[in-house]
């Protein structure tokens, strides 16, 4: 049930975006053990001047290929998060040719009462999920 938002610089073609989304989803399924159909993704494309991501003094060489993944999720362990970060960096580089320097991930955690998948219900609270 994690909700992933991808912020990228505009200009990627549909095939590249789909590969990015598919690759990130597979990494999340493996790292978090969520069901394959537990997929919620949103892409935001920005003009280059509207996306400023520096390196926090870590020496990253950012390019126009940078991707920011913001995730909202129920609580995950530190080891699950570290596995996700590593899988994303490895697989996005291999499959999408996105350098690990161009990847930033942020996870915000929430609880069962913070989700409604429709019908005005909190499915985690009412036992439907």
Swiss-Prot record:
SUPFAM superfamilies: Tautomerase/MIF (SSF55331). The keyword Oxidoreductase does not apply. Its EC number is 5.3.2.-. It is an enzyme of class 5 (isomerase). Keywords: Isomerase. Gene3D superfamilies: Macrophage Migration Inhibitory Factor. InterPro entries: Tauto_MSAD, Tautomerase/MIF_sf. The keyword Isomerase applies. The active site is at residue 2. It comes from the Bacteria. One of its GO terms (molecular function) is isomerase activity. Belongs to the 4-oxalocrotonate tautomerase family. This is Probable tautomerase YolI. The lineage of its organism: Bacteria, Bacillati, Bacillota, Bacilli, Bacillales. The gene is yolI.
